[in-house]
């Protein structure tokens, strides 16, 4: 049997059920051709308002792009939105009170947008309504936001958050993998869904309190293989408390991966958790 909490999955059934890392070369060629042909054969249409999109093949109009709420004042560790009037928390190297008290297992989170209208419409469409075409648009959006920030030291691999088998059977796909495929095309970083897997089905995290989320996800992941990489990015659609990606990062760190980033399209604000009083510079010690 596989060992939980960082062990390798060892049963034949688990091995055969594992997700594949590399897509066939033909699929990559077809995807690339379709992506280029779409902008030539069809006018891009905004996925939100139906107006004219932006060339080439970007399905959002400038007006709807402007309506997206950016996560510009956030903790530099977990990307939790902070209250206050500072325009850019990253320039001030602020960490939230939760990260000061209990640093996450990952090194930093990149969540360029807030989980709010109209972006939540696109994410819910991908996640719950089978609109996998939204993954291409979301990947383009994400790549636009972070490309310059990772230019000097991009991660070597993208690792999507594994979906519980029950939810995978219900949906027929993993939205984190769909988003990861788009990021792989946009940023030329390999997507590897065969590095880590869930060892058991967990309850839906939605609706659970922070402590309950940590208990629910504890020891729910195990390594399928040890990648030849020292810097990776975990990919997901939305971060709420960060419990899932934090548990994944714990297992990946135990496997020897030195630097772990978390990439998500959006960060859901946790009302009342972080205020100006809990936002402190990274080099400031917590008062005893």
Per-range role (PLM):
Residues 2-236, 240-288:
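Glycine-rich phosphate/pyrophosphate-handling loop used in enzymes and phosphotransfer proteins
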């Amino acid at each position: 049997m596989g060992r939980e909490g960082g062990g390798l999955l060892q049963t034949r059934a688990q091995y055969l059920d594992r997700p594949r890392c590399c897509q066939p070369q033909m699929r990559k060629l077809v995807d690339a051709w379709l992506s280029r042909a779409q902008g030539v054969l069809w006018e891009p249409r905004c996925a939100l308002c139906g107006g004219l999109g932006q060339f080439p093949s970007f399905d959002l109009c400038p007006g709807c792009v402007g309506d997206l709420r950016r996560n510009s004042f956030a903790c530099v560790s977990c990307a939790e939105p902070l209250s206050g009037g500072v325009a850019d928390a990253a320039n001030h190297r602020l960490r939230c009170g939760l990260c000061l008290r209990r640093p996450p297992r990952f090194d930093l989170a990149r969540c360029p947008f807030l989980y709010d209208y109209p972006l939540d419409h696109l994410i819910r469409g991908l996640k719950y309504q089978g609109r996998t075409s939204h993954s291409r648009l979301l990947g383009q959006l994400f790549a636009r936001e972070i490309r310059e920030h990772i230019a000097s030291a991009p991660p070597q691999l993208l690792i999507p958050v594994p979906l519980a088998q029950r939810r995978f059977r219900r949906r027929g796909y993993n939205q984190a993998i769909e988003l990861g495929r788009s990021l792989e095309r946009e940023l030329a970083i390999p997507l590897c869904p065969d590095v880590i897997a869930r060892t058991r089905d967990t309850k839906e995290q939605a609706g659970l309190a922070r402590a309950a989320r940590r208990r629910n996800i504890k020891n729910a992941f195990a390594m399928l293989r040890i990648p030849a990489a020292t810097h990776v990015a975990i990919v997901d659609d939305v971060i709420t408390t960060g419990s899932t990606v934090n548990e994944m990062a714990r297992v990946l760190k135990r496997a020897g991966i030195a630097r772990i980033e978390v990439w998500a399209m959006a960060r859901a604000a946790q009302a009342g958790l972080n205020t100006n009083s809990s936002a402190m510079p990274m080099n400031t010690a917590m008062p005893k």
